[in-house]
């Protein structure tokens, strides 16, 4: 039944990943494991249990939430494998929204960097993002590592889905050499600027 479901330009085939067919409407408290990285300027909270996303980034100098995040975790049934949670910064690969955005990923902390990643069963690749904050900087750095464990060339997309509050203080800027962008599907190429 699910294999014929088209999902944002991708096949609904998800085997061998687990599929969650429904979620409860019952509200209950739940604790999530989190990594907190901070310096005197910013504080970032990372949630490896929810697909390895950056849940929040706070500007400590003015108590401003740099990215939009939900105060509660309330999944919706819009993900390829079922649940998905909006907000924060979601790291996606090898296709549009990762199928595992609500599934725990591997994580470890090493040398003041938190590494979160997983093995992709569809393409036999491993993707990891290392998140760090330098002591004297007011930004978060993401270091991306993709490893192809096969002898074959693999196409993939890597993108970060960042939630921001819509207001007049935000703009999307691309380098001047960017002439095209992708939608959810790598086959959907749009000219830039629009």
Language-model region placement:
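Extended, loop-rich substrate-binding clefts of extracytoplasmic carbohydrate-active enzymes
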Residues: 2-29, 34-38, 85-139
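Acidic, contiguous internal or C-terminal segments within carbohydrate-active enzymes
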Residues: 24, 44-62, 118-167
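Polysaccharide-binding surfaces and accessory modules of carbohydrate-active proteins
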Residues: 62-93, 98, 141, 147-194
């Amino acid at each position: 039944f699910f294999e014929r479901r088209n999902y944002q330009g991708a096949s609904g085939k998800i085997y061998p990943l687990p599929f969650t067919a429904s979620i409860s409407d019952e509200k209950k408290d739940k604790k999530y494991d989190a990594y907190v990285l901070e310096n005197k300027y910013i504080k970032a909270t990372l949630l490896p249990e929810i697909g390895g996303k950056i849940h929040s980034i706070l500007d400590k100098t003015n108590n401003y939430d740099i990215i939009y995040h939900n105060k509660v975790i309330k999944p919706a049934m819009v993900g390829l494998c079922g649940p998905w949670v909006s907000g924060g910064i979601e790291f996606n690969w090898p296709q549009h929204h990762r199928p595992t955005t609500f599934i725990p990923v591997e994580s470890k902390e090493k040398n003041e960097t938190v590494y979160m990643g997983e093995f992709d069963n569809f393409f036999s690749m491993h993707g990891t993002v290392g998140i760090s904050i330098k002591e004297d900087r007011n930004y978060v750095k993401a270091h991306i590592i993709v490893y192809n464990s096969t002898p074959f060339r693999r196409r993939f997309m890597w993108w970060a889905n960042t939630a921001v509050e819509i207001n007049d203080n935000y703009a999307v800027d691309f380098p001047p050499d960017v002439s095209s962008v992708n939608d959810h599907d790598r086959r959907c190429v749009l000219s830039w600027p629009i």
